[in-house]
Amino acid sequence: MATIEYDRSIPSLSITFSNGAKRTYSDTDIFICFGLLRKEFSDITFLCKGSKINVYPSAMASQMSSGFVAYEVEMGDPEAKLVRIFDYEENELTNDVNEQILYRNKWAKSI
């Protein structure tokens, strides 16, 4: 079990495990911090929208929300759905932000 906490003012994201171990990630927004966390703990499945392969923030969404919201897209569909990255999700998850970027690029070409 672990607890994830954030600080919008920095922005930073911290994970604290039940054994007391703690790691903190700071970057330009919370989505990027979450990507760093997922990369380091790639053996853990994070059950949230921010881990879904077809979810990635736009620059504007990132700036306006500090990275807490992103767009969920579907191939061939120009409509993108705004989602909160820590909302529950269990399908099509990845810990590799590069896979999310590749999906986003393929989606852009599909519309």
Residue ranges of predicted features:
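Glycine-centered tight beta-turn/hairpin loop motif at sheet-sheet or coil-to-beta transitions
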Residues: S18-G20
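Long, contiguous binding/interaction regions
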Residues: M1-S14, R23-F41, T45-I111
